[in-house]
Design a protein with these regions (language model features):
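Class I Rossmann-like S-adenosyl-L-methionine
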Residues: 3, 7-167
Length: 167
């Protein structure tokens, strides 16, 4: 089932939250390699205020645009294979931590509630632990060589950074 169908099914029954919608879009993008702008625009045609639309757009594009940096920060805290919903929720949460002025307690609370709804209580505990661990230990880029540091900090593929550096 595509995101569009899922949204249309869910809308009449519950009042969707911005982060839930952003997560649905990110999951659809990851699983189906869908066009982000089309999926986002379709999701935003529903009853959202301008500020809610802004938050959804910021969360979706921000998470994707900074993905390499967010993955770099997440990587050492993952000790098991994550489901797509868990990985995308963690990346979106880390985006809020590093780039938005969202308090950590709010990020963790919202993430845990979302994952408990979608998976189970145990997954909520895992998300809680991973986020707290990530918030305590931010990885430095200083130990990386110049090209790797530039690749991760700008979230551009290493091959592209090397190509531009060589010119």
């Amino acid at each position: 089932m595509s995101l569009w169908h899922a949204i249309l099914i869910r809308i009449p029954h519950i009042n969707m939250k911005e982060r839930d919608t952003a997560l649905d879009i990110l999951i659809d993008y990851e699983k189906n390699e869908s066009y982000l702008n089309i999926t986002l625009n379709h999701a935003l045609t529903h009853d959202f205020s301008p500020s809610e639309r802004g938050l959804i757009t910021t969360l979706v594009y921000g998470t994707i645009q900074n993905r390499l940096y967010l993955e770099y920060q997440l990587e050492p805290h993952i000790h098991t294979r994550l489901k797509v919903v868990e990985r995308m929720l963690l990346l979106m949460s880390l985006y809020q931590h590093f780039y938005l002025d969202t308090p950590d307690y709010a990020i963790v609370n919202e993430a845990v509630e979302i994952i408990k709804e979608r998976r189970n209580k145990r997954a909520g505990g895992m998300i809680n632990a991973i986020l707290h661990s990530c918030f305590k230990e931010t990885r430095s880029l200083d130990d990386l060589d110049h090209d790797e540091r530039l690749s991760i900090s700008t979230s551009h593929p290493l091959w592209m950074v090397k190509m531009f550096s060589a010119q």
